[in-house]
Amino acid sequence: MTSANIDDSEFRALRELSAEVGVDPLRTQGAGGNTSIKRDGVMWIKASGTWLADALAHDIMTPVRLQPLRKAIADGDPRAAAAVDFVDAQLNASGLRPSIETSVHAIIPSPVVVHIHCVNTIALAVRYDGESLVRERLRPHADVALASVPYRKPGLPLAHAISERLTKNTNVFVLANHGLVVAGETVAEVADRMTRVCEAFFAPSRAAPQADTERLASIVEGTDYRLPQDPATHVVALDPKSLAIARLGSLYPDHVVFLGPGLAEALLDGGRLRAPPERRRPPLMMALPGLGVVLHHSASKNAHAMARCLADIAARIPEDAPVRVLTSAEEQELMNWEAETYRQSIGR
């Protein structure tokens, strides 16, 4: 059985909502984000490495037995981290692994849970004063029961942090340096609440000049670098304030996972492109201040999506905002993580 074959209007509605947020780069980028629905002791959750944008075209949901997974989380069973041992093999026609965030969805009691990487949310959630700003923005929304969650590594550590702040009424979780989780009884309820929360967090994007793509193309000619798939990516190098934000360090996990830590800046030697000498490997993404952005020819679709995401987020953060970036230790625990390596192999 597949989730696409289940005759249930809520399943259909979740697939439609998943696809809707999946094609909106301001809500979800690449293989990021995940959705779930709980039915008859089974939680159907987006499979690792799949794209929410494909929810209507492909079977992207994996069935997980809820009760044993919750017990494993409570007991400190290390199998809860990957959750592969709790997949219902008879229902899992796709054979895919569950999302890295399966434990997060499992500990939230609500039947429907949606986790997105909303750029307006992240632009607030990377700030040291973000929690107070978030609460102020959500004050007019009486139905929102908020939990502000400090940064933790995605997956089981994040699930434990959420569990410590979870009440029976909590339905919105703002995750520091990460994103947004919205929960509810029905897909329609979650969709409405998510839309209102994202609108409450709206921030205008700073304007930037257009990139001189002809000049950039001539600079990368004969090198291993290419222009980004989305021209909006160039903003992070063209807007000095956005570039200053990006230079601070890694703002959220998927940047590290798909692009590597921080932001490399290319050097021009007689008009020829050179990577910064301190980088042991060719960076997947490089900024040319005042000119634009280039990506390595090996960069995946996910990497291109995350490059655009960085531009979108940085352009929404005021230049004087107190920004928290991931520490070196937090970056290291995201790199060479087996679960993320698998996700990248599926999502290229």
Where are the predicted features?
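Glycine-rich flexible loops
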Residues: M1-R348
